[in-house]
Amino acid sequence: MAENKFLDKINSPADVKKLSVPQLEQLAKEIRQLLISVISHTGGHLAPNLGVVELTLALHKVFNTPEDKIIFDVGHQAYIHKIITGRREQFPTLRQYGGLSGFPKRSESEHDAFGTGHSSTSISAALGMACARDLQGEDYNVVAVIGDGSMTGGMAFEALNNAGMLHKNMIVVLNDNEMSISKNVGAMSEYLYQLRTGETYNKIKNDIEGWLKNMEFGSDVLKAIRRLKGSVKYLMVLTSIFEELGFTYLGPVDGHDLESLLDVMQAAKKIDGPVMVHVLTKKGKGYKPAEESPNKFHGTGPFDIATGKKITNPNAPVSYTEVFGKTLTKLADTDDKIVGITAAMPDGTGLNIFAEAHKDHFFDVGIAEQHAVTAAAGMAAAGMKPVAAIYSTFMQRAYDSIMHDICMQKLHVTLCLDRAGLVGDDGYTHHGVFDYAYLRSIPNMTIMAPKDENELQHMLKTALDFDGPVSVRYPRGSGVGVALDTQWQDLPIGKAEVLRTGKDVCFWAIGSMVQTALDAAELLEAQGISAGVVNMRFAKPLDVELLREHAQSYGKIITLEEGVLAGGVGSAILEELNENKLLEQCDVRCFGIPDEFVMHGDKKLLFRDLGLDTPTIAAKAAAFVKGEEE
């Protein structure tokens, strides 16, 4: 990488403030080179960050963190913020075990005002800070940086509505690149398109300039407006949706023109009440492959800089996500009742495969998990077979809809939870470890988890043939590598599969932990310990008959789950055994995620730290059998 003229001297925002606009432009080039170089090795959110380099520099040039608060919605576009707030030298450790988080993290830096990872939270948090500031008689600026994709989330609208009513001094920077991960959908996206293209500006008053000149700080605002993309018409006085909500609207401004950005931010600081600054950026700017395919470089693994091609293992098994997408597509080929629903993640969930074949039966509702689930309930009530594919961590946002709109009415909705379990580099905001617990407590819910990618096919067919609420959860990444059946059978509801018989102890494992149980049983056999293995298949209902039999015949059971122990599958087994007064005959140990938020890092290292790797489980099982536990 070429020698840096300015970047190597940037150790805090104070160093950014010393630079002129031409120097900042050079710094932006150097930062882009660093982003491309590091992320090509570590993986990460490349395209979003390439698009906000100038914007982030302008924010830190104008505002004074940590006194002023800058909140990045989702936070995946905060890499530049990290680089210029004292973490430049650590940046090569991004998303690595023990290294920098890929998202803002309050414990990582005083400049990270608010931790983020999920969408559409920034305006609410910023408003809360502004209220706290005023109540405590303090004086600082609060800025929320939110993408147009996040603006499809209902929470953002709730916050805008409340902020306009409270009229607190705060700034919302709308980073408009026409993308979230996939192409944005919804009325707000259409509205922003009209703002970008100037189709709704016929109501602009001729006397705006005179009005501004007569108001306090008006000349500064006018100076900024004149730099806005196009002309003064882009100030929507009392006509834009943001003005109707009580915001002063400034924009759109070119998000890669530093002079324009600096001027508009300075002006926004001086306006009383909430301000919306509309910034137009290009996702992936500065790296041609990312500009041409911004969705592919939204979140990427390691890649070759010269070609932009991802560095992958050609021998890796097919992913669970792909198996899901292809299976659902094939099932829909012969059943026109099936519909697929996603919340702005068609590629991430595999529903892009389904959408290509069944366009009219595919619905991308935007970043709106609660709406997605209730819309699915409505479809089910009207006779369809909806499948809502949403990441496990994001499904948390739809909990009330699952309970109130699906399960209370016993509607036939299939919830497919991708990225269940530990996801690795994205860390605790994205680990999908709570779904067993939060779904198991809901009456009428059936919960399945496949031991491998082939069983996922059978479970999906089972779910669609079952008349009631069903959830199927499966992990991120490649499958186990088993052969895929071409004909699928319904699995008996609530029945487990005995994979291995033993005498001394039995593993009751579910989902991704079944293979770990089999491997641990092999290690135990080498020590003269005979271990059975059960593939639970169902977290709810349990195979009560088999469980009672094993409690009496083995006398020792170990549960394995890639989810939290509190309220999880192990808890379900303990509850059942206790209810049947079998805990006096059977000793149980539960292995899973402890009561903590798990950090980011390579999954193998995280499993080792949690004691969920095969050698540790085998060692603990041996000690359990021998009565040698510490």
Segments the model singles out, each with a brief description of its role:
Residues V221-P289, H412-L417, Y436-T486, T614-E630:
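Structural signature of the thiamine diphosphate
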Residues D263-Q266, H298-G299, G308, S319-T334, ...:
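Glycine-/acidic-rich phosphate or pyrophosphate-binding loops and their flanking alpha/beta elements
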Residues E178-F324:
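Long, well-ordered, tryptophan-enriched scaffold segments
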Residues H45-L166, Y320, I338, T342-A343, ...:
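Cofactor-binding active-site loop characterized by glycine-rich and histidine/acidic residues
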Residues K69, T281-Q396, S401-L411, G468, ...:
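Non-catalytic terminal/interface segments that mediate subunit docking, oligomerization
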Residues P302-A316, G424-D426, T446, S571-E630:
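Peripheral docking tails and interdomain loops at the edges
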Residues A2-I84, E243-L262, V275-T281:
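N-terminal amphipathic, basic-rich helices that act as targeting or association modules
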Residues D364-V365, L518-A551:
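Generic long, charged, amphipathic alpha-helical segments
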